[in-house]
From Swiss-Prot:
Induction: Up-regulated by cold stress, but down-regulated by drought and salt stress. It comes from Arabidopsis thaliana. Belongs to the HMGB family. SUPFAM superfamilies: HMG-box. This is High mobility group B protein 2. Gene3D superfamilies: High mobility group box domain (1.10.30.10). One of its GO terms (biological process) is chromatin organization. Binds preferentially double-stranded DNA. Confers sensitivity to salt and drought stresses. Residues 1-42, 57-94, 106-144 are annotated as: Disordered. GO terms for cellular component: chromatin; cytosol; nucleus.
């Protein structure tokens, strides 16, 4: 049996086949997020989760696992009928409408750009530095 490999040779060849991506080949840096941008609204399930967390904590005060709460909530959500989900869907829809209104106002504000009256801190300090230079002499003298 020429060319047959032993078990250890087979294992080592399988291990050597796996390749790791080169450094820097991953995702690029994410763009800086604007802290003033409105947050996206919660889905009906997450609105349900807000209520469910409170009741679950009361029933299971010793539970510290987030995964357990999430799993229990998911199971409960799946077991609910459409009529039982309706109030959560309505709340989510209401939040979505409010979000759309806020995002339109936010985008409109972005399109307008900064107002001319407002100056950035940097430009104000540059103006003050120029004023200071005009008031004093060109060269600073030591009083020693």
């Amino acid at each position: 049996m020429k060319g047959a490999k032993s078990k250890t040779e087979t294992r080592s060849s399988k291990l050597s086949v796996t390749k790791k991506p080169a450094k820097g080949a991953g995702r690029g840096k994410a763009a800086a997020k604007d802290p003033n941008k409105p947050k996206r609204p919660a889905s009906a399930f997450f609105v349900f989760m807000e209520d469910f967390r409170e009741t679950f904590k009361k029933e299971n005060p010793k539970n510290k696992s987030v995964a357990t709460v999430g799993k229990a909530a998911g199971d409960k959500w799946k077991s609910l009928s459409d009529s039982e989900k309706a109030p959560y869907v309505a709340k989510a829809e209401k939040r979505k409408v409010e979000y759309e209104k806020n995002i339109k106002a936010y985008n409109k504000k972005l399109e307008e750009g900064p107002k001319e009256d407002e100056e950035s801190d940097k430009s104000v300090s540059e103006v003050n530095d120029e004023d200071d230079a005009e008031d004093g002499s060109e060269e600073e003298e030591d009083d020693d």
